[in-house]
Amino acid sequence: MSNPQKALNDFLSSESVHTHDSSRKQSNKQSSDEGRSSSQPSHHHSGGTNNNNNNNNNNNNSNNNNNGNDGGNDDDYDYEMQDYRPSPQSARPTPTYVPQYSVESGTAFPIQEVIPSAYINTQDINHKDNGPPSASSNRAFRPRGQTTVSANVLNIEDFYKNADDAHTIPESHLSRRRSRSRATSNAGHSANTGATNGRTTGAQTNMESNESPRNVPIMVKPKTLYQNPQTPTVLPSTYHPINKWSSVKNTYLKEFLAEFMGTMVMIIFGSAVVCQVNVAGKIQQDNFNVALDNLNVTGSSAETIDAMKSLTSLVSSVAGGTFDDVALGWAAAVVMGYFCAGGSAISGAHLNPSITLANLVYRGFPLKKVPYYFAGQLIGAFTGALILFIWYKRVLQEAYSDWWMNESVAGMFCVFPKPYLSSGRQFFSEFLCGAMLQAGTFALTDPYTCLSSDVFPLMMFILIFIINASMAYQTGTAMNLARDLGPRLALYAVGFDHKMLWVHHHHFFWVPMVGPFIGALMGGLVYDVCIYQGHESPVNWSLPVYKEMIMRAWFRRPGWKKRNRARRTSDLSDFSYNNDDDEEFGERMALQKTKTKSSISDNENEAGEKKVQFKSVQRGKRTFGGIPTILEEEDSIETASLGATTTDSIGLSDTSSEDSHYGNAKKVT
């Protein structure tokens, strides 16, 4: 593979990728038709068979002409926009950027997993047979042919063949592929009899369909954007919970427990590195001071003692590590927390409330999940700090006699600023760190620019390391509300000084709580304005989308609905009214109210007839498939859905309801 890019271009320009399947399908259809014609009873005249053969040949000629036209226009085929479907301009974009597929049940599912042992009905997916008509091939196994799921994936075998031949004879290879595809489509045109033609074409088709090795099917289901969609999950399709806790864990508490586990592991590893470096250095300094005191006792000269004391400024204590180990340790702790949270498979491993908030604003993260994420992250950080303090308590007591009121001990679990920094500089430090973290995270998880997610943990390691190595001096780079507030609450629970935790340094505790949030929003905004191209971000929304959201929020406020409920007569929108006030409402007010969804006709003797009714799509009651047509009795929905609601509404007659927007129902005889 001397030039992979050139090989890929040659492959995309080849018409056989698109015409091969169509010619194979035509051959299958021709062979089945001719097989039926050859199996007719013997008392039929031969003229009928000849006519059928002539018709088949004519059809083949027309299909060949069409195939030739498709091949001629293949260079103008737009591979990027082949699955493009325009959406309404006022519709809010969704965070899923891959199409949804359906298997046997027919219901669309979000593409999220890799199921290596799935049983797929190839009739439902491919709408054709890729192998011999056996029961096992239809249910348990299938060849690696193009399916609905893999139709947009390149044929890797052909790709490598093109790559090997790209530097020698690319044109001859292209012509050979075209001639092979056209020869397959013309297989029935040169045959003499219909029976022989049907047997030959059927044999060739079966041989072509059995070229690929048969194996267990694998369904690739990418993630949504806020879950780093390029990393799949591997879960057997036969898996199911076998106890109550497994059911609860995989339904209600799945994402909460993932964030709890990941944040707890991150805090334990990260704070343990800081404790090891600082406590080991403190104990080493204490031992050095004891050695100096022994020199004074033995009567050493003053010059010798001064020279030994100067070593404290020249040589750093490295018994448990240095400052570089802290930055490296925190970077590794974040990556290990990411994996312990399930990576991108369960919750996306945010481990940071500011990351969750930025995904909510810029990546379509569900609002209802935010409290679970915040709770899991905060409780996980609290638990991790508490476990670590219990583990290191004896060592802390040995190194620091006043551990409960020593800021150096508290700084091993939460962050503290330099004493000479003002509140404004403290806030700006955390704001900048949070912005850089969020911009880097969006850059690493951008599906439109990040070509591979295999190196995502390594890139995240580098990002956390460079932030801690370059921005940790002033305030300690909390960058995370849970990382600072959780351990701070844990230290307060075990008896640390109240003023040291909540009062000192101009009440610094609020800075790691507010600064990372605003910084993450600003960092995500700058990245989306400059780089991001997806429609999930509000930066890339159109103006009608904003207008629709504002109008919807305005007319759905509680005061508006309460004030206009008596005047509303239509379910099409929340802001429609009756006629003008200058009309006479005497007759309307005389009508009785009804709670049914349909208006009964004034003619009691009129027989109920079936009608084709277009169900109105109402705000808050939208259906998944658009506007369905239903066949119901007259006294169910009818056209009175515009004149009556489930609550108290004025019952209108059939004539008045049929004059409304969607009241033109057609009677079925």
Curated annotation (Swiss-Prot):
Residues 1-99, 123-147, 167-215, 591-615, 635-669 are annotated as: Disordered. Residues 50-68, 191-206 have a biased composition (Low complexity). It comes from the Eukaryota. Residues 276-325, 391-446, 528-669 are cytoplasmic. The chain crosses the membrane at residues 255-275, 326-346, 370-390, 447-467, 507-527. It is found in: Membrane. It holds the Pfam family MIP. Residues 1-254, 347-369, 468-506 are extracellular. GO terms for molecular function: glycerol channel activity; glycerol transmembrane transporter activity; water channel activity. SUPFAM superfamilies: Aquaporin-like (SSF81338). The modification Phosphothreonine is found at T168. Residues 72-81 have a biased composition (Acidic residues). The modification Phosphoserine is found at S150, S209, S212. PROSITE patterns: MIP. A motif (NPA 1) lies at residues 352-354. One of its GO terms (biological process) is glycerol metabolic process. Keywords: Glycerol metabolism, Membrane, Phosphoprotein, Repeat, Transmembrane, Transmembrane helix, Transport. GO terms for cellular component: cell periphery; cytoplasm; fungal-type vacuole; plasma membrane. Residues 1-16, 87-99, 133-147, 638-655 have a biased composition (Polar residues). Present with 907 molecules/cell in log phase SD medium. Belongs to the MIP/aquaporin (TC 1.A.8) family. Channel protein for glycerol. Has a role in both glycerol influx and efflux. Plays a role in osmoregulation: under osmotic stress the channel is apparently closed to allow accumulation of glycerol in the cell under hyperosmotic conditions. PANTHER family: AQUAPORIN OR AQUAGLYCEROPORIN RELATED, AQUAPORIN-9. Aquaporins contain two tandem repeats each containing three membrane-spanning domains and a pore-forming loop with the signature motif Asn-Pro/Leu-Ala/Ser (NPA). This is Glycerol uptake/efflux facilitator protein. The lineage of its organism: Eukaryota, Fungi, Dikarya, Ascomycota, Saccharomycotina.
